[in-house]
């Protein structure tokens, strides 16, 4: 992907009557076009967040939401578009029980290099246990961020309050790990 591009996503089955634009599309200023195919899985399907990032040196579009496939690729709730094809992120994010979903993503550097931070409702990454409802993707693999949160993480924001940039989480949780 090069230059500025506008992508839209959401809870829709078609756009202007075109079902190929299911849940995600690209706008060129005149018309909408397909972004590598549609999403699939158990209903309801939705793409809840898009993030364009070059944190690993490549211009990539990350999609997060509630889906099992995107563009014919198995991708549990999170995927990356390189301008040509979708790819899963090492098996994606899921839950041991109930439905999983990615609600928000942001790019941030915690001092070990820029990475993708993901919040939502999940406790497995690539089928392995991970911090509840928050995870870090370094471009190769998932890692935990402490023990996580007791409920959904709706938003992640990097902010410098004057003492250095930090990552803040907002959501419907009341506990961070074992702390209220």
Task: Set out the residue ranges of the language-model regions.
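Extracytoplasmic surface signature
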Residues: 1-180
């Amino acid at each position: 992907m090069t230059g500025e591009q506008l992508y839209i996503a959401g809870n829709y089955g078609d756009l202007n009557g075109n079902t190929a634009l299911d849940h995600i599309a690209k706008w060129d200023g005149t018309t909408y076009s397909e972004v590598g195919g549609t999403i699939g899985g158990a209903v309801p399907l939705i793409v809840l967040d898009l993030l364009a990032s070059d944190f690993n040196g490549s211009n990539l579009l990350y999609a997060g939401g509630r889906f099992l496939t995107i563009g014919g690729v198995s991708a549990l709730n999170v995927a990356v578009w390189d301008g040509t094809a979708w790819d899963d992120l090492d098996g994606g994010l899921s839950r041991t029980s109930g439905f999983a979903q990615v609600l928000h993503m942001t790019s941030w550097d915690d001092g070990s290099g820029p990475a993708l931070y993901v919040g939502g409702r999940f406790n497995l990454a690539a089928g392995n246990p991970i911090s509840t409802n928050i995870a870090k993707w370094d471009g190769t693999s998932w890692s935990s961020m402490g023990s996580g949160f007791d409920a959904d993480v709706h938003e992640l924001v990097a902010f410098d309050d004057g003492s250095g940039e930090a990552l803040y989480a907002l959501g419907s949780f009341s506990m961070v790990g074992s702390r209220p």
